[in-house]
Amino acid sequence: MGDSVSSSSRVSVHQSLGAGSVADLLLWRNRTGAVILLISSTGFWFLFERAGYNLLSFVSNVLLLLVAIFFLWAKSATVLNRPLPPVPNMEIPEEFANKAADDLRVWINYVLSIASDITIARNPIRLLQVSLVLWAISYVGTLINSLTLVYIGVLLSLSFPIVYEKYQDHIDEKVNSTSKFVRNISRKFPLPINKEKKHQ
């Protein structure tokens, strides 16, 4: 009985990841895409981190190669009366730029609201949360560089969702018990009460 209740209230990992192509990729339902992502990210990490290749020189060499190939293709096409190379329209649509600007504005406003919550409202819990996150980022930054951190993020994003989907009940049970434990501990700390005078 308890199993049927927990399975009926269980949220699908595929649905929570958006139920689209990204969810299929992260849950290895699109095995080809997941393998390509894993191999390409490993190749880039090895190329830039272990082989010591520079990102700027890599990008400039790739662009130089593409420009040379398209130039030679276009010149040979005019000489041999062949069609020109199919170069896509290299232009950012206005709708895409507006949507990106709106999304960026939402994130900036969220960060500013957190800063306002810390400074103006003097929320000590939010200050502690932000301080811990910033300290953790700083500490991790001293241990590894950003490219390795991105590579670890790719590896975790390809492994954690599938593990969570397989062992969702056990993980949820442990997270709930940990959350209850943390809540019980945090209740023992007194919170300052804001006493504001009301002006009428």
Swiss-Prot record:
Primary location group: endoplasmic reticulum
Tree of life domain: Eukaryota
Keywords linked to the UniProt accession: Endoplasmic reticulum, Membrane, Transmembrane, Transmembrane helix
Residue ranges of domain Reticulon in the record: 22-200
Single GO cellular component term: endoplasmic reticulum membrane
Subcellular location field: Endoplasmic reticulum membrane
Membrane topology: Multi-pass membrane protein
Keyword Flavoprotein appears in the UniProt entry: no
Presence of the UniProt keyword Endoplasmic reticulum in the record: yes
Transmembrane portions of the chain: 33-53, 54-74, 143-163
GO biological process: response to bacterium
Name of the protein in question: Reticulon-like protein B11
Organism encoding this protein: Arabidopsis thaliana (Mouse-ear cress)
Phylogenetic classification of the source organism: Eukaryota, Viridiplantae, Streptophyta, Embryophyta, Tracheophyta
